[in-house]
Amino acid sequence: YGEVMRECLAAAFPHYDPERRILMENAGFADTPEGRLFCPGSSLEVAWFLLHLLQRFPDDARRRQVLEIIEGSLEFGWDGEFGGLYYFMDVNGRPTLQLESSMKLWWPHTEAIYAVLLAHSISGDEKWMAWLERLDTYAYKHFADPEYGEWFGYCDRQGNLTHSLKGNNYKGSFHVPRFLLLSIQLLERHRPSA
C-alpha cells in the first residue's frame, strides 16, 4: 500500500494553483468551466488527506505547501459578505455550471474544521485557531440542530436553511461523524498531561 499512497500524494499536486494556493477540482482543462472549478470543501479534504500521508512519508517542503493550500482554500473560499464556505466557485469569477455553487453546504465546513485542527497540531500557529473560531461559529449556527441533533445540510448564500431534511441521496451520516471522530482523536492525542 505504500506505493499507492505515494502515488496518491503525487497525483494531488498537478491540481495545485500556486497563485491562489488552492487545489483545483480538475487539472489540465485550461480556460474551461471545468478547468476553472474550485470546490473549497474538496480542496480542504484533500489537503488533510495529504497531511496524513505526509506523516507517513515526511517531506517538510510539501507539508508547508499543504498548510498553504489549507490557508489559501479558506481565504479564497470564504464568503466575506455572508460568511461560510462556498460550495463551488469559478476562480475567475465567472458563472459556474453548478447551479448550487453559491450555496453553503454542511460537509465543506466539517472538512475545514478538521483541516484547521490538524494544521494547528502540526504547526502550532495560532492563525488556525482564529479560523477554527470562525468556522465553528458559522457551522454550529447554521447547520447543527441543537434540539434534535445531527446537522442540516443546505443553506442559501445568506445562511438560511433551504431544506429541513438531514438525510437524502447526497447527505448521509458520513462527513459529520468522521470529522467529529477525527477531531476528538486528534485532540485527545494532543491533550496536555495532567
Predicted region positions:
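Glycan-recognition and catalytic cores of secretory/periplasmic carbohydrate-active enzymes
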Residues: 1-194
